[in-house]
Amino acid sequence: FTKELKALVIEYGLDQNISFVGNRKDIKEIMSISKIVFSLSKEPEAFGRISLESLSLGIPVIAYSHGGVKEQLIKLLPKGLIEVGKINDVVNLALRWVAKPPKIKKNNFFTLEKMLKNTLNVYKKEIEKK
């Protein structure tokens, strides 16, 4: 899959604009200088932390429309959702966003406070059942 993406990057003349960085420990620094972050796993992720971190930094995300990333983008950047496997749609959207970056909604949905509150509520309901 990576070979296919790299070939498309070259085919569309984007090799000066897109980097494939592999596994890194300085991902926040890499993301902060990125124009777009891609989440193109063919298998759905349960939560999609990288996508949410990117959106929180103001970096738009283009992702396949499934899993936790889909839930995030529906709330924060619905235009970033692409049907799984539609790589040409990914490339075309990336070209548009390089020219004119999209606006990202403020993340009021996926916050630590809300996650903690929801988790505590689950425990409270279970305790009340007993």
Q: Can you annotate each of these PLM segments?
A:
Residues 28, 51-56, 70-71:
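Short alpha-helical segment that forms part of, or immediately flanks, the ligand-binding pocket
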Residues 9, 73:
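Conserved hydrophobic residues forming the short capping helix/wall of the S-adenosyl-L-methionine
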Residues 23, 30, 86-93, 111, ...:
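Hydrophobic alpha-helical packing elements
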Residues 1-4, 15-23, 30, 81:
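Active-site donor-binding acidic/aromatic loop of nucleotide-activated sugar
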Residues 99-129:
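A charged, aromatic-enriched C-terminal amphipathic alpha-helix characteristic of glycosyltransferases
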Residues 24, 42, 59, 63-70, ...:
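Short glycine-rich donor-binding/catalytic loop of glycosyltransferases
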Residues 32-46, 59:
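Acidic donor-binding loop of glycosyltransferase active sites
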Residues 75-87, 95-99:
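Conserved acidic donor-binding segment of nucleotide-sugar-dependent glycosyltransferases
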